Structures are given as structure tokens and as C-alpha cells.
Regions:
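Low-complexity acidic/polar repeat-biased segments
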Residues: 1-12, 20-21, 108-155
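Acidic, glycine-rich calcium-binding repeat modules characteristic of RTX/beta-roll
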Residues: 20-24, 28-101
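An exposed tryptophan-centered "aromatic clamp" motif
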Residues: 102-106
Length: 155
């Protein structure tokens, strides 16, 4: 397990029609905690956030590549691979990426995806632009697999 610094609790809850309650963060570093016992959607926004899952289905959703960059990524806590999901479909759509290439080495070309697992922390890295930092998310205490990630959402 990684050592986790304490961040202030933040975000604003909304209740979209026909969707689970959604907690949206700001561009500040903050801790967003899902509702216990019911489905929740957590959207961190900018800054290196901590998104905390609770009992019940949680969706950790990303809309822009700047929501979690490789030089200061978000950390997901209490991720349950049997019912939770990381949704990066908005990041890919925002960057006009229509195909991905999952590989073992670092991402080189736009659309390349790398999943690593070291010392109890998994990291998802996606090359979203030719230059600049990659989109990146750390998942504490879970061996992250491609089936835990929604790359292309069908709406």
C-alpha cells in the first residue's frame, strides 16, 4: 500500500435524472468520497485528487486529460474490481482518440495504454497528445486490468 497524505474533503453532489448520484470535484487537490451502500459517480476535475470508493458500484469518471496528469496523478482508493469501473471514454473522446493499443512498455504513440503494478499500486497511463504529460491514474491496493476500464462508452 502507498502512503497517502490527507487532503481536504471537497466536491459538490448532483443527482442527474436516471443516473447515480455524481460528486464533481474542482481544480484543487481534494478528497472525494462515494456514498456508502449506493452507486456513485466520482469526477475529480483537475489537481491530484483522492477518489474514495465505498460499498456499492462506483464509477471513477474522467472527462479531460488534464483531470489527472502523469506528473501529478489522482489516486483511487477502495477500488473494488468486481463492481467498480474507471471511465476514461471522455478523455479519449476529448482528444479524438478512436483506437487504443494496450502495451507492456511506456506509451509512445497517441492511443497507447500502459498498465503497471508495483508495490501494491497499479498505474494507468494513456498517451493522449504527441507532446506533454500523459493522462495517468494510480489505483491503490488493486491489480488493475483492462476489463476494469471503460475506454469507449456507448451513449
Amino acid at each position: 500500500m502507498s502512503s497517502i497524505e490527507s487532503l481536504p474533503t471537497g466536491g459538490t453532489w448532483t443527482h442527474p435524472e436516471n443516473s447515480p448520484p455524481t460528486l464533481r470535484g474542482t481544480d484543487q487537490r481534494e478528497r472525494l468520497e462515494a456514498k456508502r451502500g449506493e452507486p456513485s459517480v466520482l469526477i475529480g476535475g483537475g489537481g491530484a485528487d483522492q477518489l474514495v470508493g465505498r460499498q456499492g458500484e462506483n464509477i471513477f469518471k474522467y472527462e479531460k486529460s488534464t483531470d489527472s496528469l502523469s506528473d501529478d496523478p489522482d489516486t483511487l482508493l477502495n477500488f473494488n474490481p468486481k463492481e467498480d469501473e474507471i471511465d476514461v471514454s471522455g478523455v479519449l473522446k476529448d482528444n479524438n482518440i478512436s483506437a487504443i493499443n494496450i502495451q507492456s512498455g511506456p506509451p509512445v504513440d497517441v492511443g497507447d495504454v500502459q498498465l503497471t503494478h508495483e508495490f501494491g499500486v497499479s498505474t494507468l497511463n494513456i498517451k493522449v497528445t504527441p507532446e506533454g504529460p500523459n493522462f495517468s491514474v494510480r489505483v491503490d491496493g488493486v491489480h488493475l486490468l483492462p476489463q476494469h476500464i471503460n475506454f469507449f462508452h456507448s451513449d
